[in-house]
């Protein structure tokens, strides 16, 4: 049986990384071992291997054609990992920029990854705003709940588009305050 490639997405502050890490720990206890990778980290590693950057901040300064090439190579590198074990890719469905929403998984990346499942982690805009305000470890842009909810709508639309292009299923998981265990269990049931 082919190893799964699962993409987990969500707006900053929704808790996608936390849910995924906890699910990985529990699955590991059952002998189910996914490799978890962050798409941006793999891109950075590829750019470093090519001596294009020394630190992660230099990534966004690369010209667009180079960035596309690095994205494609990162997708290919992750697809190679799936030959060895199932993989969960932690990334963003869309990235909110001053000029609009940028697809987190453009078609040249999707063609390389060919995911089996796309997970969209969500909760209310109010909950995300409060989490962001309480997170002193990150320097996030201040955003209204309406802006956060718009971003989540765009994530859903993008995720369904990714599903249409690849045949991947799309699963939405709610990560409500004080109900983390439910979200973790829901992710585990998808990953089994």
UniProtKB/Swiss-Prot annotation:
Pfam families: AAA_17. Its main location: cytoplasm. ATP binds at residues 10-18. The gene is adkA. GO terms for molecular function: adenylate kinase activity; ATP binding. This is Adenylate kinase. Monomer. InterPro entries: Adenylate_kinase_AdkA, P-loop_NTPase. It comes from Methanothermococcus thermolithotrophicus (Methanococcus thermolithotrophicus).
């Amino acid at each position: 049986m082919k190893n799964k490639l699962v993409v987990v997405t969500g707006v900053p502050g929704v808790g996608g990384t936390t849910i995924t890490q906890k699910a990985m720990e529990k699955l590991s206890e059952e002998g189910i071992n996914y490799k978890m990778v962050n798409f941006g980290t793999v891109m950075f590693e590829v750019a470093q291997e090519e001596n294009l950057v020394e630190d992660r901040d230099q990534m966004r300064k690369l010209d667009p054609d180079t960035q596309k090439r690095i994205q494609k190579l990162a997708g290919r590198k992750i697809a190679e990992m799936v030959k060895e074990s199932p993989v969960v890719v932690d990334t963003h469905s869309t990235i909110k920029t001053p000029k609009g929403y940028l697809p987190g998984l453009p078609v040249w990346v999707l063609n390389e990854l060919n995911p089996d499942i796309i997970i969209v982690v969500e909760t209310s805009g109010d909950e995300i705003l409060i989490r962001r305000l309480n997170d002193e470890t990150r320097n996030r842009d201040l955003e209204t709940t309406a802006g956060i909810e718009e971003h989540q709508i765009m994530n859903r639309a993008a995720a369904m588009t990714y599903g249409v292009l690849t045949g991947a299923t799309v699963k939405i998981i709610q990560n409500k305050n004080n109900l983390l265990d439910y979200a973790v269990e829901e992710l585990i049931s998808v990953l089994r």
